[in-house]
Amino acid sequence: TRRSSDLKAHRQRLKNLKRVESRNQRSIATYVNSLFDQHAKLLVIRLDIGYRKAYYDQLTLDLVTNDLNGYLRRIQNKYPALVGYIWKLEYGVDRRFHTHITFIFNGAIHQRDISLGIALGEVWEDMSDNNGSYFNCQVRREEYREWGTDGIGMVHYSDTTKRINLINALSYLTKLDTQILAVLPAGRRTFGRMERPSRQPRLGRPRLLFCRSD
């Protein structure tokens, strides 16, 4: 029957998505370690971007996707010291479409995470004609410290604990969000990252083997 066929297709889709999730999780540590191969310290900024409630009725997946792609391009053009980013698109009844983004900057160039987070958020508001909203997660760093999960702000190459916290936090972004499946056509991405040129490890800096996400 058609119903059983649809159910089978849904189960296969979930299976495929879980496989992609596992692959993405494994790649996170490799991605972060490759950045530390080239930089002694990284400034990590977490930003949540979305839309104001008055704009919810106008939102479509294509509009949200185009806005996100345009925003990430603008940030790359505006900040040459941006060395990486990872994003995850989510959907909720209360917040509708929203995206969690972790921006990673060369820590030798940028040091002020809170003010930079505000600047990144203001770029989003500006390009969305003030229909967009954002939350700068840097203001919650004290809470993260108390919970033992602080992996944002300045992260030094030698700070094993903070690097593991960073990888764990980024691994969360790869988790399968079942709510968005209802509004997301098969084949559309909910997770992505800034592609980097071929790895060129910094001279004199040994590769790390201890920062893993499993």
Language model feature labels by segment:
Residues 105-128:
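Helical (often loop-to-helix) elements that flank the catalytic cores of nucleotide-handling enzymes
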Residues 128-167:
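Acidic-leaning, charged glycine-interspersed low-complexity segments
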Residues 171-214:
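Long, low-complexity, charged/polar intrinsically disordered accessory regions
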Residues 1-4:
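Short, small-residue-biased leader/transition segments that mark boundaries at the very start
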Residues 30-91:
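Signature for HUH/AEP ssDNA processing cores
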Residues 59-67, 112, 116, 120, ...:
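Short amphipathic alpha-helical segments
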Residues 85-108:
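Histidine-centered divalent-metal-coordination microenvironment in nucleic-acid enzymes
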